[in-house]
Amino acid sequence: MMCNLLLSCSVLLLSCSHLLAHPVTDTADMTYSGPDSVEEAGGVNPDDFSVSDLNEHLQRAAVAGYSPLFSQENIKVPGQIPKEALRELLLEKPYRLIPPRGLWGSRRQFRKRGGGADCFWKYCI
């Protein structure tokens, strides 16, 4: 028993020694030396891209074997729902919005017990 305790403490101390070897820096003393704005960082404005640039990037991605995030036929971001699909979902197939009954759990009715059972609400003794 004492051997297990001693072994556990030594393993704990050995594992903590690696953590104590790293210096702890206070972030209040550190200064941010990055650019103050996007223009200074050399970022690209999304309005600067044209459709030809986008097609060029898509072709490069297709050659590299990546699946493009944008489709070339109709440029759209995945996750956006077209109006026709939204209309179909809301008007024509409203049952798709209701989750299956199993997710909410069953709502079976509790019947009263006959006899001299002491019951409070639905719990009987």
UniProtKB/Swiss-Prot annotation:
Subcellular location: Secreted
Gene Ontology cellular component list: extracellular region
InterPro entries in the cross-refs: Urotensin_II
Pro-peptide positions on chain: 109-111
Signal peptide residue numbers: 1-21
Keyword Signal set for record: yes
Keywords for the protein's UniProt record, in alphabetical order: Cleavage on pair of basic residues, Disulfide bond, Hormone, Secreted, Signal
One Gene Ontology biological process: blood vessel diameter maintenance
Pfam families named among the record's database cross-references: Urotensin_II
An annotated Gene Ontology molecular function: hormone activity
Disulfide bridge map: C119-C124
Role according to the record: Urotensin is found in the teleost caudal neurosecretory system. It has a suggested role in osmoregulation and as a corticotropin-releasing factor. The non-hormonal portion of this precursor may be a urotensin binding protein, urophysin.
Family indicated by similarity: Belongs to the urotensin-2 family.
Name of the protein in its database record: Prepro-urotensin II-gamma
Native source species: Cyprinus carpio
Organismal lineage: Eukaryota, Metazoa, Chordata, Craniata, Vertebrata
